[in-house]
Amino acid sequence: MAPPWLPAVGFTLVPSLGGFLSSRNVLGKGLHWYAGLQKPSWHPPHWTLAPIWGTLYSAMGYGSYMIWKELGGFSEEAVVPLGLYAGQLALNWAWPPLFFGARQMGWALVDLVLTGGVAAATAVAWYQVSPLAARLLYPYLAWLAFAATLNYCVWRDNQGRRGGRRPSE
C-alpha cells in the first residue's frame, strides 16, 4: 500500500514537472532569441523565473491535492474543480512552446489570457470546496496578469519578430 503522503507529493510535483518539460524551448536557441527582443524596463531578471514558477506550481499543486482529498478523490463532485484545474494547467504548459518554440508572441498572449480566465474559474470552483485551496491560486492569478502584460509589451515592441519569424541565430 502507498504511504499516505504520496498523493500530496504527487499532486504538488506534477505542475512543476509539466512546466519543466514544456519549457525545454526556453533553453538554447529560444533563450538566445528572447535575449535579443526589446523588453520593458520592469521585466524580471531571468534568474527569478525558476523560483517564482516553482513556488506557484507547488502552491497550485498542493491546492489541487486539497480539493481531491476533500471531494474523496476523482469523484463525480471533483469533475468541475479538477477539470478546470487540468484545463488551465494544459493552457499554462502550452505557453512556452508557443512563445519560445514557435515564436508566436500573439498566440502566446491569447493562451495567457485564456489561462487566466480558466485559472480564475478554477479559483471560484475551488472556493466552494476549500477557501484555503482557492487562496493558494491567488498569487498565480496575479502572476498571470503580470505575465500577460509583459507578453503584450514584448509582442507590441517587437513588430518585426511577430508570427514566428526566426531571425538568424
UniProtKB/Swiss-Prot annotation:
Summary of the tissues where the protein is detected: Ubiquitous.
Mitochondrial intermembrane topological intervals: 1-5, 68-79, 127-134
Gene Ontology biological process terms in this record: lipid transport
Keywords in alphabetical order: Lipid transport, Membrane, Mitochondrion, Receptor, Transmembrane, Transmembrane helix, Transport
Topology, Cytoplasmic side: 27-46, 101-105, 156-169
InterPro entries linked: TspO/MBR-related_sf, TspO_MBR
Keyword Membrane appears in the UniProt entry: yes
Record Pfam families: TspO_MBR
Record localization: Mitochondrion membrane
Domain of life: Eukaryota
The keyword Transport is assigned to this record: yes
Protein's job: Promotes the transport of cholesterol across mitochondrial membranes and may play a role in lipid metabolism, but its precise physiological role is controversial. It is apparently not required for steroid hormone biosynthesis. Can bind protoporphyrin IX and may play a role in the transport of porphyrins and heme. Was initially identified as peripheral-type benzodiazepine receptor; can also bind isoquinoline carboxamides.
Protein name, per record: Translocator protein
Organism: Sus scrofa (Pig)
Gene name of the encoded protein: TSPO
